[in-house]
Amino acid sequence: MSRLRIFADTNPATPEFDSRDGDAIAAELVKIGVTFERWHASAPVEPGATPEQVMDAYRADIDRISAERGFKTVDVVSIAPDNPKREEMRAKFLDEHFHKEDEVRFFVAGSGLFTLHVDAKVYEIECVKDDLIAVPDGTLHWFDMGPEPHFVAIRFFTEPDGWVGHFTGTEIAKQFPRYAPKKPHKAS
C-alpha cells in the first residue's frame, strides 16, 4: 500500500505526517508540485509480459499524460531480486540529486521509495503497483529500490539526456532509513 511520511529534514526519527490514503497523499504532494495518481490497467498484465504488452494495458493513461506534459519517449524498466547488478543499480540513485526534466514513473508491479527534499522537509513516498509519481525537474530527491528490488515501471521522458542525475554532494540521504519493504507472509 502506498505511503507518505513527511519529516523535518533535521529529524529523521519522527514524521510530522504519515498516511496510506491515496487522496491524502496526493493532496500533500500537490502542495510541492508533485503529481500522485492511481491508475488501473485496461487489460491484465501478466508476469513476463513484454514492454509492448505493459504499455498497451495502460495506453489511455500513457497517451493522456504524454500529451499533457509533452513526453516524447516512454519505456519500461523491470528489475528483479535475482538481477546480478541489483546492488550497483540500487546504489546509483541513493544519494541526493536532481534531474533537468520531470521524473515520471508509473509502477506496474512491485515498489520503490522516492524521497524528496523540499523547503527543509523530507517527503518519503513509498510507491507501489498502480501508483504514478511525477517529480518536477530540479527537485532534490533520491530513490531506493530496496536490497531485493522487485518492480516494473513505465518511465516517461521529454529528452533522453535530461534524465541524467546531478548530485548535490550532501549527506542528507544517509540520515534517513533505507527502503526495506516488508515481504509478504507465506501461509504455513
Curated annotation (Swiss-Prot):
CDD domains: cupin_ARD. It comes from Xanthomonas axonopodis pv. citri (strain 306). The record marks R105 as: Important to generate the dianion. Monomer. Its EC number is 1.13.11.54, 1.13.11.53. It is an enzyme of class 1 (oxidoreductase). It comes from the Bacteria. Belongs to the acireductone dioxygenase (ARD) family. Transmembrane segments: none annotated. SUPFAM superfamilies: RmlC-like cupins (SSF51182). Its cofactor is Fe(2+); Ni(2+). GO terms for biological process: L-methionine salvage from methylthioadenosine; L-methionine salvage from S-adenosylmethionine. One of its GO terms (molecular function) is acireductone dioxygenase [iron(II)-requiring] activity. Keywords: Amino-acid biosynthesis, Dioxygenase, Iron, Metal-binding, Methionine biosynthesis, Nickel, Oxidoreductase. It holds the Pfam family ARD. Pathway: Amino-acid biosynthesis; L-methionine biosynthesis via salvage pathway; L-methionine from S-methyl-5-thio-alpha-D-ribose 1-phosphate: step 5/6. The record marks D102 as: May play a role in transmitting local conformational changes. The record marks E96 as: May play a role in metal incorporation in vivo. This is Acireductone dioxygenase. Gene3D superfamilies: Jelly Rolls (2.60.120.10).
